[in-house]
Amino acid sequence: MLFLRFFIFTFFTSIFTVVVSEPPVSAKFAKRVLSATSSSSSTCPEFITIFSEGPSEYITTIYPSSKSSGRGTTNHSTIYTTINSGTVASTYTVTLADGDVVVKDIEPTAGTVTTTITSGSHEFTTTLAEASGTVPGTVEVVEPLAGTVTTTIHSGSVEYNTTLATASGTVPGTVEVVEPAVGTVTTTIYSGSEEFTTTLASASGSISGTVEVIEPTAGTVTTTIYSGDQEYTTILAEASGTVPGTVEVIEPAVGTVTTTTYSGSVEYTTTLVPASGSVSGTVEVVEPAVGTVTTTLQSGSQAFTTTVPASGSVSGTVEVVQPTGGTVTNTVYEGSQTITSTLATASGTVPGTVEVILPGPSTIYSGTVATTITYDVSSTPASTVVVIPTAVCNGERGLQYAVYNYDISSSKNQFCATSGVTDVSSFTQPAYFGSSDLDQSSPLFTGVLSSSDSVPQWTSSYNLPGYPPDATAMGSTSSACKVIVYQFFFRVPVTDTFSLDVTNVDDVFYGWFGDKAISGWSNTNYDTYAYWHATNGQTGIASFSMGSLTADTYVPVRFVVANGAGKGGFDFSFVDSEGNSYNPTSYAYTATCTESFLPFGQGNGGVDN
C-alpha cells in the first residue's frame, strides 16, 4: 500500500516548513530527492516539485508560504523520516540551501489509526480509546496475516496449535497458537447449531471466573463434545470458493450420563468409565429403538417376524428375522452331542461354511415282517449339504403334507404307464421330492392336518384325498402320477414299545424315522417300504418296529407315497405293545422346542443319491 507524501515548505528568510503524514509501517526509510524544480522563473517559486526514489516512484508538491526570497532548485537532497501511523501533522523548521536538505525524524502522533497483526482469519475494526476533546480516538484495524506465528486468546480450556495456511516456497505457513483465557468473558467459534453460555472457572478473590460463550458458526473446524462412546469426524458444510467447509469433530464425553438408541428389543444400562475422584463415571443407557423395523440374520431357512407390543404412546418394535443367504452347511454324523462349527467366515459375496455335527443313530431297528428293511448303526449316512433351522416352541399340532406331480423323466413312462399296469419297481428316487434336484417351484397342494381332522387315510381312489385347507379342489384332482410327502413329529403317548403299521398301499410307500427324517433322507436309507403287488392286485402292507419309546418324547417321521396309473391310497397308525392304535393327527406336531422340519420343495432335506 503506497501513500503520497506531501511536503509543504513555508519560507521565512531562507526558512521553510515540512509537514509529514505517513501510513503505519514499522521500519525507518531513507528517501533520496532526485530533483526539485520551480513552477516559474521568479526569485521565489510558486511551488517546488520533488521527485523521490523508493519502492514505487511518486510526486510530492511543496508549497512555499509566501513569495519571499528563496531558491527555486534543490538537487540531490536527502530526507530522513520515521514512518509511523499518524493522522496529525508535525512541523519542523530546516534551512533552505543548495545541495542536501536534512529533515529531522518525525515523531508519531497519538490517537492515530493503527494496524495490528493478529492470528485470526477475519478482518475487523475495534475502537481502543474514545475521542476526548480535540484528541481523536484510537482505532485498531485487525487484519489476518499469513506466514506469522502469533498467539490468540481463546475461550476454550485446551491449548493446541493449528496451521491456517500451508507454506509456499520461501513463505512460511501461518501457525495459530491457541491458549485458554483466564478470568475473561470470551467467545468461542463452535460448529454446533445452539448458542449457550457456560462457566469454565469460578471467580476467586479479585480474579473473575472464565465464562465461555458458545456461538454457532459456519466454515470453521471445531470440536464438539458428544455423549456417545465413539469418536468420528463429519463435514457439515462443503467448501465453496474461498470459504472453507465446516468440519465437526465428535468426541466422547467423559463423566456424563448419556442415552444411546439401539435397534434391539432389550433395554439395559452399562458403565463405560468408572468414577474417579470428583469425576463421575460414564453411564450408557441403551434403549430399544421406537417403532423401528430391524433385520437379524439367522442361519436357518425360515423367515419369521416377531412384534414387541406397543406401550402407551410408544409404538411397538417389529423384528424381522431372515434366514442367512448362501450359507453352506455340512451335516456330519458322529459323536453323541449336537454341535455347530463355523469352518469359513463369509467374505463379500462368498458364503461361509457351517458344519453341523449330529449324534449317530443309537437305536438298531429290526423286524421280521415282509418288506421291512433293517439298517445297522455302522451304516454311513449319505454326505449332503443341508441347513437345519432353529425350531420354535409353539409348533402347530398336526401333520404337514405336500403334493407334487411325478416328473422323474427316467422312470415316468414306466411308473405312470398310460396302458397296462404300473411298474412299481421303477420308482427308486423318493428323496428327489425333497432335494435340490426337484424341478418344481412349489407343491400342487400343501397344508396341515390338525388334531381336529380325521386320520389322513387315503382310501383307494382315482382322486387325491381331500385334505384342508382346500379340500374340495384337492379331492377333485386326479391321483394319477402324483406324489404326497408327509412330515411330522410323533409325540409318544406312553412309555412302551411301538410299531408303525402301514396298510392299503397303492402304489409305493417309503418311510424314514429319527434325525434323518428331517435332513439327510435319501433313496437308500429309508426304514420301511411297501408297494402294490401287480401279480395278484393286492395293496401293500408293512409293519416297522420303532423299539422302546419314552412318553412325551418326539420322533421325527417322514413318508413318501406315490401313485402311478389308476387308483392311489394308503393308511397308517402307531400301535403299542398291547395293540392299542393311536390317531396320528392327535399325536403329530409340526415342530418341537428344539427341532423343526425344513420347508417343502428344494432343500427339504432329501438327498437324491
From Swiss-Prot:
PROSITE patterns associated with the record: PA14
Residues annotated as domain PA14: 427-589
Signal peptide bounds: 1-21
Gene3D superfamilies cross-referenced by the UniProt entry: 2.60.120.1560
Glycosylation site positions: N75, N161
Cited Pfam families: GLEYA (PF10528)
GO biological process, one term: flocculation
Location relative to the cell: Cell surface
Segments of this protein annotated with the region 9 X 36 AA approximate tandem repeats: 75-391
Family: Belongs to the mam3/map4 family.
Protein name according to UniProt: Putative cell agglutination protein pfl4
Protein source organism: Schizosaccharomyces pombe (strain 972 / ATCC 24843)
